[in-house]
């Protein structure tokens, strides 16, 4: 479960680079939304991984 949390964290960082880097307006908005979604998924999987141990 912790592995999935790290994967979602990396995806969130990549989305942040694209979203906050100023590539294009449309892509930036999508990347910002994806960033927040994957951060939430990262936190949920991190908590589930800690609780199950």
Curated annotation (Swiss-Prot):
It comes from Burkholderia multivorans (strain ATCC 17616 / 249). This is UPF0391 membrane protein Bmul_5473/BMULJ_06024. GO terms for cellular component: plasma membrane. It holds the Pfam family DUF1328. It is found in: Cell membrane. Keywords: Cell membrane, Membrane, Transmembrane, Transmembrane helix. The keyword Transmembrane applies. It is a multi-pass membrane protein. Belongs to the UPF0391 family. The lineage of its organism: Bacteria, Pseudomonadati, Pseudomonadota, Betaproteobacteria, Burkholderiales. It comes from the Bacteria. Its main location: membrane. The chain crosses the membrane at residues 5-25, 30-50. InterPro entries: DUF1328 (IPR009760).
């Amino acid at each position: 479960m912790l592995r999935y949390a790290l994967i979602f964290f990396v995806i969130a960082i990549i989305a942040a680079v694209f979203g906050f880097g100023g590539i294009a307006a449309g892509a930036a908005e999508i990347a910002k939304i994806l960033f927040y979604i994957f951060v939430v998924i990262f936190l949920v999987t991190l908590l589930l991984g800690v609780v199950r141990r």
